[in-house]
Amino acid sequence: MLMPKRVKYRREHRGKMRGRAKGGTEIAFGEFGLQAQAASWITNRQIEAARRAMTRYMKRGGKVWIKIFPSKPYTAKPLEVRMGSGKGAPEGWVAVVKPGKIMFEIAGVSEEVAREALRLAAHKLPVKCKFVKREENGGESNEN
């Protein structure tokens, strides 16, 4: 599972997910990518499930880059506990994803294999996604 090695503070505010992604909106390493269409928290378990789905379908061919990292802790109080008495215990880690962010990239496989692998990965994620591929001049073309 992905998680930070150490953090300065164990608990964080939830924060807002306004606007579009500032960086990471273009394909940097691979040939094909999976782009978020909405804002969401993505847990380290969801990232791992998507990675496994992609690599299983590609059968050890190609390379996968994970472009998001769960660096934000989220907390939860136990069941049937009254309100108050402090913030809950850290429960897990999430990556904050905004619209336009490229979450995964793939290289070394055909477009059909990449499209299906990224479709399987998108089913594991709580956010609507779009398949994008790199253009010759370095950007990406948005194809569905």
UniProtKB/Swiss-Prot annotation:
Key words, A-Z: Ribonucleoprotein, Ribosomal protein, RNA-binding, rRNA-binding, tRNA-binding
Record-linked Gene3D superfamilies: Ribosomal protein L10e/L16
CDD domains attached to this UniProt entry: Ribosomal_L16_L10e
Coiled coil: none
Keyword Transport: no
GO molecular function, one term: rRNA binding
Quaternary structure note: Part of the 50S ribosomal subunit.
Task performed by this protein: Binds 23S rRNA and is also seen to make contacts with the A and possibly P site tRNAs.
Stated name of the protein: Large ribosomal subunit protein uL16
